[in-house]
């Protein structure tokens, strides 16, 4: 396919020029997100790497399944630096819950804003927050302590939710404008778990958290964020129904994660292979 060939060539060019120069100049010597690392994102945008995940009607250019293209993007970047590949895949992962299970309104709103040059000249970037801190363990994707509860629900109006979430090893947090976060119910008026979208401008605390010190992947941004925010219930990924006065998300966080990871296994596997081979 011509579109796949072109994105592979463009990615290879970025990897062996922009990313290779960063590695040679010692960009991996710091865990902090720097101006030089930020320029890598702009190179991704210019090469079409950022838009490769989107549908054509959202500003993308690859029709149909994109697993092969995304896997090859990860492979080309990881051949030079695993952190660069992680940054690219994490941006896709932030949008994946919306792409797989989001409402049409959510897809249109967030996907179009992440395609360069964004909306009204402002481009958004996202992060995916699943893992949480566990004392003496690190993380466990099977444990979910983030909570949502209802703080305001006036008759005839949309409920306002309080989101409490602490993240661990969350990629892209230095520059994320929004986060898709996994949370569980902390209120008897909300049934089960879900994924919810939080934005930097929401009321409350959007703390990007402490920088994570890593042995590898220093060209990616990793932090341990803390969120305590009020958001409208329409941010629940996939929407919700009200049954007997209870908010019932249409998709649990487990269902969304299963749908997302089913599509990301191939890109991650190929990226890992490139890191080992290089």
Regions found by a protein language model. Give the residues of each.
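Short acidic, glycine/serine/threonine-rich loops at helix termini
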Residues: 99, 137-143, 173-176, 207-209, ...
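Glycine- and acidic
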Residues: 1, 22-26, 54-58, 95, ...
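Generic recognition of stable, solvent-exposed alpha-helical segments in well-folded globular domains
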Residues: 2, 6-10, 14, 35-39, ...
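A short core secondary-structure module
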Residues: 158-210
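Glycine-rich beta->alpha junctions and the first turn(s) of the following alpha-helix
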Residues: 210-278
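N-terminal glycine-rich flavin-associated loop
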Residues: 85-112, 136-139, 148-151, 157
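A short, Trp-centered hydrophobic/proline-enriched beta-strand micro-motif
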Residues: 121-132
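Amphipathic, small/basic residue-rich leader segments at the start of a protein or domain
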Residues: 1-89, 108-119
